[in-house]
Each structure stands twice: as C-alpha cells, then as structure tokens.
C-alpha cells in the first residue's frame, strides 16, 4: 500500500513539474499585458486590433526585451488582482500610482501625465469648480453647492477614488473618519462611455475622467463639453504595475522606459495620439 501511495505521489510530482515547465515555456518569449481597451487614446480597439498610446509603448518595451506582446482586455478593476496572481505580467491602462495600489503592486517610472477633467451637458448649471464646491478663504473645499449632485465615473479609476473621498479632501462624498461613506454621490460605470451616456440621459450631473478620453467622448457626442479654464479636477502621473515579487521585470521595464524616453520613442508615440499643436 505504501509503495502504491509513493508511486502515485511520484507520478503527481513528475506531472506537476512537467506542467510547470510547459507553462514556463509557453510564456518564455511572451509578455502578457492586462488593459481595459475602452480608454482612448491610451487603449482602445479598432475591429480586432488594439490601438493607443499604452499599446504602442508596451509593444516597444516588449521589443526591447526581445519578447512578443500579448494583450488581455479585462475590466479595469481586475487588472491589479490579475497581476498579483500572475495571470498577467504587467498592467498598463492609463493607471495612476496611489498609496492604496502600492499596497498590492509595484509601479514603474512615469511615462505620461494625465489630467482629470469635468464633462457637463451644454447649458448645465455647473460652469466651474466654484459651481460644485463651497470654498473657504484658503481655497479649500468645505461643502457642496448642490448636496444632491450625482457624479459619473468609470469604476475603480482614480476619478472614482478621488470623487469617493470626503469633501474636505476634494471628494464628493460625506465620509466618516473610519472611511465609512454616509452619503455616496458617485455613480460608477464599467466604462467611460457608459458614464457619458448617463450624463446625456440626465442620470448624472457631470462626469469626471481623464482629459484625453474626455476629448474623444466629447468629439463623438453632441450636447456635452469639458469645463475649460482653471477647472482641472486633478493632475496625475501614469505608470505600469508589476507584481511585487517580480522585481526583475520591473527593472527591465524601467530600463526600457528610460531608453525609449531617451531616444524619443515615447515622445513620438504620445505626439501621434495627442498632437501638441491641438
């Protein structure tokens, strides 16, 4: 009986080893990037093809590392978890470095800067940040002009994170010291396009999202516009997330980013999608 059990265990160990080798061999020459391809011009799809700033930068990184790039299009909120679990080698989706995210993954050096802006319907009573917040003499928010305001965001993005905070931290919610939200004014959608559709149908009063996708949404939809002037909601840096234990890949990505910045590749990619002449 013991011999049979030992034989079974040995066979199982051999199978596990062979599977591990097969798995490693399958991905040996491939980098799997997790993204959410609904965030133009950083990542989007044309037919079956992936396009955008992040896609082209990721491709350039893969080429630097002598790898093939494979792209997994997933919900934004599942990217970090998938990178943690090893399903994906890295996540790249117009992703901002935050303290909360740093608890789960590491981030590369910055490769682009994003601005969170406010989209409103034409004729909206919201004409500036002053239309949303009540400010003290120091310019800090102390309350809302309209406590019934509803704000649309793409769930799990930094727009969602920022808006979900307390009003005194430039959020739109009432939040207790322990983090409990007592009044939630944020309406979360799976994509920015859904949030914009909600704005057009009057379900939300405004949408807060990155400036570049915002410009694409406004161009594709009549009757909405971005608040202009000094009305940016937040300014942030984008980076690539990597599993904490995968320090070797992080170092390789940072080295590739430095070289691609130095030789002008990243600048040309960004200029292609966001011309400075616009």
Question: Predicted regions span which residues?
Answer:
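Extracytoplasmic small-molecule ligand-binding "clamshell" domains
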Residues: 28-95, 188, 263
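A ligand-binding cleft/hinge motif common to bilobed small-molecule-binding domains
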Residues: 77-78, 95-104, 162-165, 193, ...
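Beta->alpha turn/N-cap motifs
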Residues: 35-39, 72-77, 86-98, 114, ...
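Short helix-initiation/N-cap motifs at beta->coil->alpha
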Residues: 70-83, 174-197, 201
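Periplasmic-binding protein-like
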Residues: 37, 113-120, 211, 215-257, ...
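Flexible hinge/capping segments at coil-to-helix
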Residues: 121-150, 170-174
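Hydrophobic/proline-rich hinge and linker segments of small-molecule sensing/allosteric domains
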Residues: 32-37, 107-137, 241-244
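Short, low-complexity disordered leader/linker segments with a strong preference
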Residues: 1-31, 278
């Amino acid at each position: 009986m013991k011999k049979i059990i030992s034989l079974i265990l040995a066979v199982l160990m051999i199978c596990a080893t062979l599977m591990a080798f097969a798995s490693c061999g399958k991905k040996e020459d491939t980098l799997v990037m997790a993204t959410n391809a609904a965030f133009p011009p950083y990542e989007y799809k044309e037919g079956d093809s992936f396009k955008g700033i992040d896609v082209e930068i990721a491709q350039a990184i893969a080429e630097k590392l002598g790898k093939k790039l494979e792209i997994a299009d997933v919900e934004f909120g599942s990217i970090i978890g998938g990178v943690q679990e090893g399903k994906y080698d890295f996540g790249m989706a117009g992703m901002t470095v935050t303290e909360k995210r740093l608890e789960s993954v590491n981030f590369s050096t910055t490769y682009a800067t994003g601005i969170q802006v406010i989209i409103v319907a034409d004729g909206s009573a919201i004409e500036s940040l002053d239309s949303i917040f009540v400010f003290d003499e120091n310019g800090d928010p102390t309350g809302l002009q309209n406590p019934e305001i509803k704000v649309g965001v793409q769930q799990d993005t930094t727009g969602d994170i920022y808006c979900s905070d307390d009003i005194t931290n430039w959020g739109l919610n009432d939040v207790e010291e322990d983090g409990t939200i007592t009044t939630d004014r944020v309406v979360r959608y799976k994509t920015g396009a859904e949030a914009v559709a909600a704005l057009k149908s009057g379900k939300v009063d405004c949408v807060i999202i990155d400036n570049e996708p915002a410009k694409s949404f406004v161009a594709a939809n009549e009757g909405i516009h971005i608040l202009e002037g000094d009305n940016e909601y937040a300014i942030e840096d984008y980076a690539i997330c990597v599993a904490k234990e995968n320090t070797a890949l992080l170092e390789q990505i940072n080295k590739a980013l430095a070289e691609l910045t130095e030789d002008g590749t990243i600048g040309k990619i960004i200029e292609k999608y966001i011309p400075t002449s616009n």
